[in-house]
Each structure stands twice: as structure tokens, then as C-alpha cells.
């Protein structure tokens, strides 16, 4: 019986988390496209830490975005092809590339901010801020539980 309950818990929780992620992603892309912007949520999530830090190593991006190095490389390659970022060698460690926003990347970041805020408002409509904080705390604890194994 315990195995059945565990499976049911995993399927319900995993399905809910996956569904929420997919729906938020679709809404963000829809809002961005309606505004005439060509950017995915993954690309936006990579632009954020680069903008915040001024530049970022691909390792930092991987850690920040909870994505493997291969996924980050693919996203950065796409952003580079769109002329939104450039890679430059780190001044102290030439084995490391720093990713920097171009002028077009900075402009896109600023153009997307209102879209992200709109999406955030749509996602959290009629949900108390305290409930959002509890939800984030629970998800953070789940992440911590799984990272510490």
C-alpha cells in the first residue's frame, strides 16, 4: 500500500509541477510573441544573470538556471546567433569564457521586462503574496532535499 501511495504522490506532485512549468512557459512565449519579441523562456532565464552580473561564465549560468552545461551551451549559441550575447575569454583564466550582453541583448532584456512582469501578474492573479512565498519555500525545500541526497 505504501508503494502505491508513494507512486500516487509522485505522479500528482510531479504532474502538477510539470503542468505549471509548461503553462507558464507557454504564456510567457505567447506574451512575448504578441509584443513582437522572439525569445523563449530559457533564453530569458539566461539573459537575466548576465544582465545582473554584467557578464557570466557558463558555469554560473548553469548553476543559476538549474540546467546542464550542454543546455546552457545550446542556449548561449542561439543567443549568440541572434547577436544578443558574445563570448569573451576570462582575463584571469583563458579556459573560461565570459558571456556578455551586446547592445541588442541589453535592449531585448529591457523590452522583455514588462512582458515578464505581465506574465508574473497573470500567473499570480488572485493568489496572496504570502501563499506565493509559502509555495516558493516548499519548492526550495524540495530542491534542497533532492540536492542533499
Tell where the protein language model's regions lie, with residue ranges.
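N-terminal helix-turn-helix DNA-binding core of bacterial DNA-binding proteins
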Residues: 22, 26-70
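Residue-level marker of regulatory loop/turn positions in helix-turn-helix DNA-binding domains and
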Residues: 9, 39, 116
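C-terminal regulatory/oligomerization modules of transcriptional regulators
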Residues: 1-6, 129-149
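N-terminal leader segment of winged-helix/HTH proteins
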Residues: 1-35
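Alpha-helical linker/hinge and terminal dimerization helices associated
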Residues: 20, 24-27, 31, 65, ...
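Charged, amphipathic alpha-helical coiled-coil/dimerization segments
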Residues: 77-137
Amino acid at each position: 500500500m505504501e508503494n502505491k501511495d508513494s507512486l500516487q504522490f509522485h505522479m500528482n506532485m510531479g504532474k502538477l509541477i510539470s503542468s505549471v512549468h509548461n503553462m507558464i512557459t507557454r504564456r510567457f512565449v505567447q506574451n512575448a510573441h504578441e509584443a513582437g519579441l522572439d525569445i523563449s523562456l530559457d533564453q530569458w532565464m539566461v539573459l537575466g544573470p548576465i544582465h545582473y552580473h554584467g557578464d557570466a561564465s557558463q558555469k554560473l549560468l548553469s548553476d543559476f538556471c538549474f540546467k546542464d552545461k550542454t543546455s546552457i551551451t545550446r542556449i548561449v549559441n542561439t543567443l549568440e546567433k541572434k547577436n544578443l550575447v558574445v563570448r569573451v575569454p576570462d582575463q584571469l583564466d583563458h579556459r573560461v569564457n565570459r558571456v556578455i550582453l551586446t547592445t541588442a541583448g541589453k535592449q531585448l532584456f529591457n523590452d522583455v521586462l514588462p512582458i515578464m512582469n505581465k506574465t508574473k501578474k497573470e500567473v499570480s492573479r488572485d493568489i496572496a503574496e504570502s501563499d506565493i512565498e509559502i509555495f516558493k519555500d516548499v519548492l526550495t525545500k524540495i530542491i534542497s532535499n533532492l540536492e542533499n541526497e
